[in-house]
C-alpha cells in the first residue's frame, strides 16, 4: 500500500517535471494589471515551472525509489 502511494507520487511529479510546452503569462494591458491577484492557472504554471528546475533532484529521487522497490517492496 505504501509502495503504491510512493510510486503514484513519484510518477505524478515526474509527469509534471517533464512537461515540455511553453507556459505563457497573460499579456498585460496597462499599469494597473500588476496589482491583480494570481489566478489558479498562474499558480499551476508557476508550480510546473519550478518543477523544471528540480529535474536533477527528481532523477535522484527516482533512483532512490527504484532501490526501495527492489530492496524493501520486492518479494
Curated annotation (Swiss-Prot):
It is a single-pass type I membrane protein. It is found in: Membrane. It comes from Xenopus laevis. This is Small integral membrane protein 7-A. It comes from the Eukaryota. The keyword Membrane applies. Belongs to the SMIM7 family. Residues 75 are cytoplasmic. Residues 1-17 form the signal peptide. The chain crosses the membrane at residues 54-74. Residues 18-53 are extracellular. InterPro entries: SMIM7. Keywords: Membrane, Signal, Transmembrane, Transmembrane helix. One of its GO terms (cellular component) is membrane.
Amino acid at each position: 500500500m505504501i509502495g503504491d502511494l510512493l510510486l503514484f507520487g513519484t510518477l505524478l511529479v515526474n509527469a509534471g517535471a517533464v512537461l515540455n510546452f511553453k507556459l505563457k503569462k497573460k499579456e498585460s494591458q496597462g499599469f494597473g494589471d500588476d496589482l491583480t491577484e494570481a489566478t489558479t492557472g498562474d499558480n499551476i504554471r508557476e508550480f510546473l515551472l519550478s518543477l523544471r528546475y528540480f529535474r536533477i533532484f527528481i532523477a535522484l529521487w527516482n533512483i532512490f525509489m527504484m532501490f526501495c522497490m527492489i530492496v524493501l517492496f520486492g518479494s
